[in-house]
Structure formats: structure tokens, C-alpha cells
Amino acid sequence: MARITVEDCMERVSNRFLLVQMAIKRVKQFREGYEPLVPSKNKEIVTALREIAAAKVVPEDELSAAAAENRAE
């Protein structure tokens, strides 16, 4: 499996600090029992970064904007 880099994730999330917060939140979710959204046999943090790079996990503000857009329709 190809190596994941922060630069891969920065294509989806423009702020490094937000990227770190998203990855940490996702790792905590894994530890609470949530299932990964992408196949991975790596450590939790690598799996979280893979999910972000694959756009399976998005920032909350993007999610809120999409929900508001759906309500407007």
C-alpha cells in the first residue's frame, strides 16, 4: 500500500491544525469502536489520514454547509 503523507491530506484540508484535530478525533472514534471507512492494516493515525486523503472524512464546517444546502432544496 502506498505511503500516506501530510501533503496528500492537505489537498483536502487547507489548514494543518484542522488536519491534526480531524485525525485525532477520528483516532478517538476508532478507540470507541467506530469502524474504518477505508481498508487499512496500519496504525489508527495512519488509517485516519488515509480516510482524510480519500475524502471519507471531511471538516465539520463542510458537513454543516452541505446539510444547510440540502435543507434549502
UniProtKB/Swiss-Prot annotation:
A Pfam family recorded for this sequence: RNA_pol_Rpb6
UniProt entry tagged with the keyword Magnesium: no
Keyword list, A-Z: DNA-directed RNA polymerase, Nucleotidyltransferase, Transcription, Transferase
SUPFAM superfamilies: RPB6/omega subunit-like
Disulfide bonds: none
Gene Ontology terms describing biological process: DNA-templated transcription
E.C. code: 2.7.7.6
UniProt keyword annotation of Transcription present: yes
Swiss-Prot/TrEMBL catalytic activity: RNA(n) + a ribonucleoside 5'-triphosphate = RNA(n+1) + diphosphate
Highest taxon listed in the record's lineage: Bacteria
Alphabetized GO MF terms: DNA binding; DNA-directed RNA polymerase activity
Function in brief: Promotes RNA polymerase assembly. Latches the N- and C-terminal regions of the beta' subunit thereby facilitating its interaction with the beta and alpha subunits.
HAMAP family: RNApol_bact_RpoZ
Protein name, UniProt field: DNA-directed RNA polymerase subunit omega
Originating species: Oleidesulfovibrio alaskensis (strain ATCC BAA-1058 / DSM 17464 / G20) (Desulfovibrio alaskensis)
